[in-house]
Amino acid sequence: MAEAAAQYRHKEKRRGRIKKSERRAQILLELKLHPHVRISELARRFDASTETLRRDLDALAKDGLIDRAHGGASAPSQGHYPTLDQRNAARSEERERIAQLAAAQVRDGETIMIDSGSTTIQLARFLAYRGVTCKVITNSLPVAMTLGHGAAEVMLCPGEYLPDESAVVGPETLEFLSQFHVDRCIIGASGISDEGVSETVRGFAAVKKEMLRRASRRQLLVGSEKFGKDGLARVTRLDGLDTVVTDARPDGSLLRALSKSGVEIVVAEPSGDQKA
């Protein structure tokens, strides 16, 4: 991987200055190889001004892709946030129930936005298995690839690629999403409480917000282990949702807040029965 990065830099240096999006993608690659990068070193490598690189790092930090540090940046600490592979291995039975029930609600001919996440990957699998002829816009590579084996027409967003999440985020992703209006969006989240829906990674929170803005019907797929939890970035208030599909009915303040906000709660029971 280090050799590939070196070859990439050498090739781009011969061709001249690279595009902003390519430069930022390369910065993310550098942080996969090294725990810390300095602005002065990046400026030398990319033959760009330190002010340009400072703006790059500020933008990546704003999207939650890196941690800003004095004179440079470091890879974001992910000890508190499991990778996509780790999340896929956890609570798989509950996640499949949620995804299967959500997939059953999708109709042929619908236009849908689906975000990245372990549960939405399972949703894509069930949609492909059913052969639903919908049109899907997604920022998730696994979702796009899975639906590509079915009857769906798929558009994959551009943006900054996150290898651990197999997804794209950033300004280009948001600009792409802003061009469309869809029948429904289906998103996941890191947490849901009476304060609203939240996400640990700010870049993902921004994508979810834009998808919610662009949809007539807004659905959240969330496991009961995330009830009462608040992530770093707010995605929406509860009244920004139409439906929550989950594996267990919430109680207490969360249930009261959802009811007050008029959110439909659909529970995927172990037997496969639906409870509203």
Q: What is each model feature region?
A:
Residues 2-42, 47, 51, 62, ...:
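Conserved phosphate- and dinucleotide-binding cores of soluble alpha/beta proteins
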Residues 2-116, 124-136, 148-152:
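HTH-adjacent hinge/linker in prokaryotic transcriptional regulators
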Residues 119-123, 227-230:
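Short glycine/serine/threonine-rich phosphate/pyrophosphate-binding segments
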